[in-house]
Regions:
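Tandem repeat scaffolds
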Residues: 1-186
Length: 186
């Protein structure tokens, strides 16, 4: 187990070859893109300015992990270990990723790009999408109760196919809730 370390740049590939458990570590400018991180456990870790695009994450554990300014294209969080999955994203690009059937109560997606991201059957209750772009994101049979979408843009959420009780939306983006009804709003 590697604990309490600052891990920068290219050293991460060598570490992943020999170690599978990281606790209280900070990863800065590391390239995990297309890397095999299946079965690796990250606990109380922070990733800053890292590239995790297309990383393979089968049974990967993320417990109390924060991602800041990371590029994370095409990731399948639905393949991660669901036990204790707690993550937060700040200024991250998560386009074309999948959170299918994951439980992420209270999650924060702050100022993120979530273009064409799949949230089908995902529990996002009490989460926040403040400042995030949800263009083409897919919500179906998702729990969005008490979610904050007030500062989010370009979302399209069908209220008849998702749980949205007590969720908060801005007047400017209300058309994202009504587009499924083919209404003319002027």
């Amino acid at each position: 187990m590697i604990e309490n370390q600052l891990i920068k740049g290219e050293i991460v590939a060598a570490l992943l070859a020999v170690e599978k458990d990281f606790e209280n570590c900070r990863f800065v400018s590391c390239d995990f893109s297309e890397k095999e991180i299946s079965g690796v456990s990250f606990s109380n870790c922070e990733f800053s300015s890292c590239n995790l695009s297309m990383a393979r994450m089968n049974k990967t554990s993320f417990h109390s992990v924060i991602f800041n300014d990371c590029k994370m294209l095409g990731l399948y969080f639905d393949q991660c270990n669901p036990f204790g999955l707690t993550v937060a994203f700040n200024n991250c690009i998560l386009n074309h990723s999948s959170f299918y059937k994951t439980k992420l109560k209270g999650i924060g997606f702050l100022n993120c790009q979530l273009i064409e991201t799949d949230f089908t059957q995902t529990d996002l209750s009490s989460g926040s999408f403040s400042g995030s772009n949800l263009s083409g994101a897919h919500f179906e049979q998702s729990n969005l109760e008490k979610c904050d979408f007030r500062m989010a843009i370009h979302y399209s959420i069908n209220p008849t196919m998702n749980r949205i009780k007590k969720a908060r939306f801005s007047k400017e983006e209300i058309h994202g809730l009504l587009s499924c009804f083919d209404l003319s709003i002027e």
